[in-house]
Amino acid sequence: MELVTMHTHTNYTGHGHGTVAELVNAAAATGISAIAVTEHYPMSEAMDPTNEVSMPWDKMPQYLIDIAAAAAAHPAMDVLPGCEVDWLGAQEDRDFSALDFSNFVHVLGSVHYLDGWAFDDPAQEARWHDVGVDAVWRRYFEVWCEAASCREAPFTCMAHPDLVKKFGYRPSFNPQPLYDQAAEAVVAGGHMVEVNTSGLTYACAELFPAPDLLRTFFCAGIPCTIG
């Protein structure tokens, strides 16, 4: 069985750990045959003033150099240059048409912000109770579908599709209609989706996506990768 991991982070942001070399060395030691290094693509100072959750713009050249060096050090592995691009919706202040993503083989699209609110940040979890679980779920899938259906975005794959369940909050309604909309959006955008194992470590204690959502993607013929 081939082992791959297509969603990884490093110390190029404040919430990651280890260098690119350390990451790839560890992957090689566990028998992984393909890895994508997918640090969060830079955001503006207005969105991430301390680069806690995104890479500084001036670190991008060295980041790509480090990935190339790791690939050269492990010729038996596929070491892919990648990044994770946060979909910011109306708060987006980057012009993707003016940015060059040609150096990246694997570009993850993700939704960590709802109208400027980092809904999955433990420091901002209290707002869930103000907004309401059902409303957050509906808004999340609305924004996620906007991202997934956008052909102008640089994404090759949509990451952790139902990240909204991270804290274990579940809606009072059947989410299947939202799942159907998510699958339709991915098909419209021409993207892949990711099966992300990190959900097993959070309160939701479940892969992203949930089995029913993954089944919906499968039935729609959407290709998947693993991160």
Q: Predicted regions span which residues?
A:
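Short Asp/Glu-rich motifs
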Residues: 46-47, 91, 204-205, 224
